[in-house]
Amino acid sequence: MDKATELQNAYQAYWDALGTQEAPRQEEFNEAYKGVYSSFEEFVNDNSLIDELTAGWPEEAKTYFDRDAYIRDLQLDYLVAEGEEEAYGVRYSVVYVFDEN
């Protein structure tokens, strides 16, 4: 999938997720769009969000950290829209991630 197609699909997913009649401004979309991922967990891992949070923690404390619960709760801070992409004739599920600000 090329970048232009990804952005078109992401823009449509953003508009659908907002649930508005009026199309979002391009600047608004550009600021909000964080990327397309196979899952929200992949977004968290690719952006080192947990590593940043736990930096400086003792290793023992990290063993008690509930990654799954944190990822589930963190998803509430983002607008996550499910979609499908296609590459080489194969369709697969993706998530588009947007800031909710």
Task: Name the predicted role of every residue range.
Residues 1-101:
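Acidic interaction surfaces
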